[in-house]
């Protein structure tokens, strides 16, 4: 994990928040590369969920909601973790992460005596208005799903969708975690990508299995190494109070396999609870003429897909990070590689760090590099870049030797480098260098955009 953290700080992916004041523990800011990567992941998810399905629409619900939403959902009374404190060093731990989580047990930090277990509510509270009275108490949402449930009827009435249909949302959530650790894996402020799919009660198992397959295929599509992922099915005693079934997609992070995304069959729990406590009718009347009158009116069941956007950023960085040794023969701009563990590679080559991100996710798609900063090559390179910048995320780099510039682009995952040289002035061609293989192609300036689109469309990670 140290290498990932170092790369993120060095190349502008993630910074400690409020760093000039010493930083705020467990809170992070996303730099130029980080926000671009995060936005690209969110865009890919949004397209996969909404554009590729006729029956899924989007929503952006408020962070601050009526407190009764959280009372009804059970968060006010039950959204808590077991907590123990050390009576000596005052450290706090989740009870399930301590060897002896009971009063008098040893503190894993200093060996002092621990307190007994108590429940710690994970919701942040705030107040709306000029007073701090209980009547003005609000909560920062701990999840985005409830905003979808309370808008279910609004969406149904304004879109004329029919069951089965889904509502997708990307947004921030907040949890007052007892322990924040493992970089951006577990933080107090994070972003979720969730979709709630409303189905007939008799079809919940079918759609649960369908969305399990769809979500696995998403990560496969964007080049994640499948041998680093696995499914974990929740046993009956692990299921949340609302769930009929649950499966997690886990990824092999540096600290071990951890949850990346969950798919849950929530049954009709959420809509039924909100109907009871709000007094509103949230039943659906199915227009299918093949159903009898009694079966046509029901509360839909919900199949949920819930992914952490910030965890996805970390996962894609970990999965893409590669170290390899580069051998440079005496051929202009040519490079060959040996894997980092190949015998003799470290003695004879230079190590490069490369992020093998899918081109659709990379913060920069193509970098334009004039061979030298004279003879009009800089202006020509800028002109070629300007022809493509509306369609691709472009960078321009004229500082330093060409090999150093390649390395900088490798480290941030740029899949294509376009070198403009003296031949470019003669025949209007450029050299396109491919990140993963370091192979080079001479491409006509007129066909450069089409070449890049084709490479992106047919990209396969080596």
Swiss-Prot record:
One of its GO terms (molecular function) is glycine-tRNA ligase activity. It is an enzyme of class 6 (ligase). GO terms for cellular component: cytoplasm. It catalyses: tRNA(Gly) + glycine + ATP = glycyl-tRNA(Gly) + AMP + diphosphate. One of its GO terms (biological process) is glycyl-tRNA aminoacylation. CDD domains: GlyRS-like_core (cd00774), GlyRS_anticodon (cd00858). It comes from Treponema pallidum (strain Nichols). PROSITE patterns: AA_TRNA_LIGASE_II (PS50862). ATP binds at residues 175-177, 185-190, 259-260, 308-311. Substrate binds at residues 94, 143, 190-194, 304-308. The keyword Disulfide bond does not apply. Keywords: Aminoacyl-tRNA synthetase, ATP-binding, Cytoplasm, Ligase, Nucleotide-binding, Protein biosynthesis. Belongs to the class-II aminoacyl-tRNA synthetase family. Gene3D superfamilies: Anticodon-binding domain, Bira Bifunctional Protein, Domain 2. Its EC number is 6.1.1.14. The keyword Cytoplasm applies. Homodimer. Catalyzes the attachment of glycine to tRNA(Gly). It is found in: Cytoplasm. PANTHER family: DNA POLYMERASE SUBUNIT GAMMA-2, MITOCHONDRIAL, GLYCYL-TRNA SYNTHETASE/DNA POLYMERASE SUBUNIT GAMMA-2. This is Glycine--tRNA ligase.
């Amino acid at each position: 994990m140290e290498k990932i953290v170092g790369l993120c700080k060095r190349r502008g992916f993630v910074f400690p928040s409020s760093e000039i004041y010493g930083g705020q523990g467990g809170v992070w800011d996303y730099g130029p590369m980080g926000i671009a990567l995060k936005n690209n992941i969110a865009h890919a998810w949004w397209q996969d969920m909404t554009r590729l399905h006729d029956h899924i629409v989007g929503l952006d619900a408020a962070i601050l909601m009526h407190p009764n939403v959280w009372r009804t959902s059970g968060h006010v009374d039950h959204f808590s973790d077991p907590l123990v404190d050390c009576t000596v060093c005052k450290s706090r731990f989740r009870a399930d992460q301590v060897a002896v989580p009971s009063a008098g047990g040893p503190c894993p930090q200093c060996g002092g005596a621990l307190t007994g277990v108590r429940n710690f509510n994970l919701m942040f509270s705030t107040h709306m208005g000029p007073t701090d009275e209980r009547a003005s108490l609000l909560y920062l949402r701990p999840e985005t799903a409830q905003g979808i449930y309370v808008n279910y009827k609004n969406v149904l009435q304004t879109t004329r969708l029919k069951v089965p249909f889904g509502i997708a949302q990307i947004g921030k959530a907040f949890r007052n975690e007892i322990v924040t650790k493992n970089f951006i894996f577990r933080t107090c402020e994070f972003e979720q990508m969730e979709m709630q799919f409303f189905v007939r009660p008799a079809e919940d198992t079918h759609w649960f299995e369908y969305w399990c397959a769809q979500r696995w295929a998403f990560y496969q599509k964007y080049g994640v190494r499948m041998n680093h992922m696995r499914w974990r099915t929740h046993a009956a005693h692990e299921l949340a109070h609302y769930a009929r079934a649950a499966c997690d997609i886990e990824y092999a992070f540096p600290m071990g396999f951890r949850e990346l995304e969950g798919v849950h069959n929530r049954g009709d729990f959420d809509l039924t609870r909100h109907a009871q406590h709000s007094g509103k009718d949230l039943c659906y009347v199915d227009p299918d003429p093949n159903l009898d009158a009694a079966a046509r009116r029901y509360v839909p069941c919900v199949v949920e897909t819930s992914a952490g956007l910030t965890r996805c950023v970390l996962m894609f960085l970990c999965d893409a990070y590669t170290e390899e040794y580069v051998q440079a023969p005496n051929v202009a701009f040519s490079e060959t590689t040996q894997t980092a563990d190949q015998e003799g590679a470290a003695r004879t080559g230079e190590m490069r760090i490369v992020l093998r991100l899918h081109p659709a996710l990379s913060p920069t798609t193509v970098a334009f590099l004039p061979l030298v900063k004279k003879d009009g090559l800089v202006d020509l390179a800028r002109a070629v870049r300007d022809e493509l910048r509306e369609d691709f995320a472009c960078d321009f780099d004229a500082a330093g030797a060409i090999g150093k510039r390649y390395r900088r682009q490798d480290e941030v995952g740029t899949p294509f480098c376009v070198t403009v040289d003296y031949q470019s002035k003669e025949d209007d061609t450029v050299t396109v260098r491919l990140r993963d293989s370091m192979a080079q192609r001479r491409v006509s300036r007129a066909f450069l955009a089409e070449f890049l689109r084709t490479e992106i469309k047919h990209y396969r990670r080596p």
